[in-house]
Regions:
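All-alpha amphipathic helical-bundle segments outside canonical DNA-binding/catalytic cores
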Residues: 120, 137-151
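A hydrophobic/aromatic-rich effector-binding and dimerization subdomain
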Residues: 2-11, 75-138
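Hydrophobic recognition helices of helix-based DNA-binding modules
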Residues: 136, 159-163
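Conserved small/polar residues in nucleotide/adenosyl-binding loops
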Residues: 166-168
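Short beta-strand His + acidic residue motifs that chelate non-heme Fe in jelly-roll/DSBH
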Residues: 49-50, 72-77
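Amphipathic, well-ordered alpha-helical segments in soluble domains
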Residues: 38-41, 124-131, 151, 155-158
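Histidine-centered metal-chelating micro-motifs
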Residues: 64, 68-74, 93
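Generic protein-terminus/edge-of-domain signal
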Residues: 1-59
Length: 168
């Protein structure tokens, strides 16, 4: 039996926010398949979610990597929750070689899309997401496609390097 899920993409090449709350996460109460590539870090609280039909509990400093094709569903928050994230449209993700940037970390990402980070490493990614948020949400600044692609490649390469140091 084939299961069809609503397809979800981003309205722009890159979108980053530093204060994603339950109000926004409720959009994903119904299971959907991402066309975009989204990377997030939990900054506050905890929540239950389903990623590729497996249940996860997400806590502060957890890194969540959602590659194109991932099926996601926000189940519930167990306390006030907040995330920061950077998302890249299917069009942007399609222009780069995801496998080249992820490399041998691909099986780890599929097996474990939620990875706890130490405070220091999490802070680096939060700062990078904050920079992308300021740029992507600024009406007076348009991020060039090449800059957007490099940003996605930087994040994916960082994740590959982080995962190479973590034994999952």
């Amino acid at each position: 039996m084939k299961m069809d899920f609503p397809q979800v993409d981003l309205p722009t090449e890159v979108l980053a926010w530093t204060n994603v709350t339950e109000d926004i996460l409720n959009i994903y109460k119904q299971s959907c398949r991402l066309q975009a590539c989204i990377v997030a870090i939990c900054t506050e609280g905890s929540m239950k979610t389903s990623i590729n039909l497996l249940d996860y509990e997400i806590h502060p400093n957890d890194l969540i990597t959602l590659l194109p094709g991932t099926i996601i569903q926000f189940r519930e928050r167990t306390e006030k929750v907040c995330l920061c994230f950077a998302g890249f449209s299917a069009h942007c993700a399609g222009r780069i070689n995801l496998m080249k940037n992820i490399g041998n970390a691909y099986p780890k990402l599929i097996e474990q899309p939620v990875v706890p980070l130490n405070e220091e490493v999490a802070s680096y990614l939060k700062d990078y997401f904050a920079l992308l948020s300021r740029a992507s949400c600024n009406e007076n600044f348009e991020m060039d496609s090449e800059l957007v692609e490099l940003s996605l490649q930087t994040i994916l390469t960082s994740i590959r390097l982080i995962l190479s140091l973590i034994h999952i």
